[in-house]
Amino acid sequence: MAFLKKSLLLVLFLGLVSLSICEEEKRENEDEEKQEDDDQSENKRGLLSGILNTAGGLLGNLIGSLSNGES
């Protein structure tokens, strides 16, 4: 009977260890996915900011040239 108890405890312990390892890997994968999403969001914001700055500069030049032409 003692042999069965020890075997059962060993099986439970190994199961808990493997479950813990799986949970840790899952957390790492989720962190990596979140980091990738954050990087993509930053890239999109940077791209949008660049487009808006360029459009603003072009619009400013156009208005400036129109106001100079009217004088």
From Swiss-Prot:
Keywords: Amidation, Amphibian defense peptide, Cleavage on pair of basic residues, Cytolysis, Hemolysis, Membrane, Secreted, Signal, Target cell membrane, Target membrane. One of its GO terms (biological process) is defense response. The keyword Flavoprotein does not apply. Residues 1-22 form the signal peptide. GO terms for cellular component: extracellular region; membrane; other organism cell membrane. Pfam families: FSAP_sig_propep. Expressed by the skin glands. Residues 30-40 have a biased composition (Acidic residues). Residues 25-46 are annotated as: Disordered. The keyword Nucleus does not apply. It is found in: Secreted; Target cell membrane. The modification Asparagine amide is found at N68. Residues 23-45, 70-71 form a propeptide. It comes from the Eukaryota. Neutral peptide with no antimicrobial activity. May act in synergy with cationic peptides by enhancing their activity. Has a moderate hemolytic activity. Belongs to the frog skin active peptide (FSAP) family. Plasticin subfamily. Plasticins have huge conformational plasticity. They can display random coil, alpha-helical, beta-sheet or beta-harpin structures. This is Plasticin-C1. The lineage of its organism: Eukaryota, Metazoa, Chordata, Craniata, Vertebrata.
